[in-house]
UniProtKB/Swiss-Prot annotation:
Keywords: Metal-binding, Molybdenum, Oxidoreductase, Periplasm, Signal. GO terms for molecular function: metal ion binding; molybdopterin cofactor binding; oxidoreductase activity, acting on a sulfur group of donors, quinone or similar compound as acceptor. Its EC number is 1.8.5.-. It comes from Salmonella typhimurium (strain LT2 / SGSC1412 / ATCC 700720). Heterodimer of a catalytic subunit (MsrP) and a heme-binding subunit (MsrQ). Predicted to be exported by the Tat system. The position of the signal peptide cleavage has not been experimentally proven. Part of the MsrPQ system that repairs oxidized periplasmic proteins containing methionine sulfoxide residues (Met-O), using respiratory chain electrons. Thus protects these proteins from oxidative-stress damage caused by reactive species of oxygen and chlorine generated by the host defense mechanisms. MsrPQ is essential for the maintenance of envelope integrity under bleach stress, rescuing a wide series of structurally unrelated periplasmic proteins from methionine oxidation, including the primary periplasmic chaperone SurA and the lipoprotein Pal. This is Protein-methionine-sulfoxide reductase catalytic subunit MsrP.
Length: 334
């Protein structure tokens, strides 16, 4: 894998700068192109980090048993655990990046049922214990790229989705895989209150082509940093597709259904001109409101310590996945 250059310490801004208007401050930091086009909630998150506001501490999950295959090791600089668990998009618990860690404690993950159905010869159901014991777990260090033009490097723990699908035995009619998040308005306040949940239609749904789902990089994820996923990161099981934007990584999954037709996906339903079905990371295809050519890597420091870096096609996984899209116009099929 290509190396990401190490982050460097940035000079501390004078105290007087904190009294500038938010947009002036963000422009002074050189992040106007993307950040000033983001929703006000995302801008507020950036400004909170700029001021050094503390992020909530996530409860520790139980330790998991897993292997560390050499193929998935990396010398990329990891994003610190407190950033991975404290800076999240999970609108079911609020719009601010700190809201999931603050509010997701209400999510009940035991018992849990994950149903695999649709165009399969052998539909089946997994319970909570199956999620961490039915398939061997392995740690994979992946880049994670948000559509909002920020990125992390995360040591996820899980198993390849293809192993689960192989047990279900897809029929010849299966062309897509549809995913659905838990619908529990009493536990997920954003599902009950449109103001809290960003006006999205719930439950959250996502989808992949079958060949994307069967790719070895596609991971059903149950842990991070050696422990079970905390609720704010999508406990007890979520999807990670490292060459796609983060909103494809549906969280707290209760249903996987193989289908003949392309399934609807939440953000595409909400704003089809901004969020496509494929959502492949592509520096040459901008979001209508900001550039995707560069990204902010979230490392050990606050926003003053972050430097922009070039966005990599397919998030740096082009050698592994570009063949999936041979002949497909990536600008039209964004």
């Amino acid at each position: 894998m290509k190396k990401i250059r190490p982050l460097t310490e940035a000079d501390v801004t004078a105290e007087s700068a904190f009294f500038m208007q938010r947009r002036q401050v963000l422009k002074a930091l050189g992040i106007s192109a993307a950040a000033l086009s983001l929703p006000s909630t995302a801008q507020a998150d950036l400004f909170s980090w700029f001021k050094g506001n503390d992020r909530p501490k996530a409860p520790a999950g139980k330790p998991l048993e897993f292997s560390q295959p050499a193929a998935w090791r990396s010398d990329l600089a990891l994003t610190p655990e407190d950033k991975v668990t404290g800076y999240n998009n999970f609108y079911e618990f609020g719009l601010d990046k700190a809201d999931p860690a603050a509010n997701a404690g209400s999510l009940k993950t035991e018992p849990w049922t994950l149903k695999i159905s649709g165009e399969v010869a052998k539909p089946f159901t997994l319970d909570y214990d199956d999620l961490t014991h039915r398939f061997p777990l392995e740690e994979r260090i992946y880049r994670m790229r948000c559509v909002e033009a920020w990125s992390m490097v995360v040591p996820w723990i899980g198993f390849p989705l293809y192993k689960l699908l192989a047990q279900a035995q897809p029929t010849s009619h299966a062309k897509y895989v549809a995913f659905e998040t838990l619908y529990a308005p009493d536990d997920m306040p954003g599902q009950k209150d449109r103001f809290i949940g960003g006006g999205l239609k719930y439950p959250y749904v996502e989808g992949l082509r079958l060949d994307e789902a069967m790719h070895p990089l596609t991971l059903m994820t149950v842990g991070v940093y050696g422990k079970a996923l905390p609720p704010q990161n999508g406990a007890p099981i979520r999807l990670i597709v490292p060459w796609k934007y983060g909103f494809k990584g549906i969280k707290s999954i209760v249903s996987i259904k193989l289908t003949r037709e392309r399934p609807p996906t939440t953000w595409n339903l909400s704003a089809p001109n901004e969020y496509g079905f494929y959502a492949n990371v592509n520096p040459h295809v901008d979001h209508p409101r900001w550039s995707q050519a560069t990204e902010r890597f979230i490392g050990s420091g606050g926003i003053l310590d972050v430097q922009r870096q070039p966005t990599l096609l397919f998030n740096g996984y082009a050698n592994e996945v570009a063949s999936l899209y041979r002949g497909l116009n990536l600008r039209e099929n964004f």
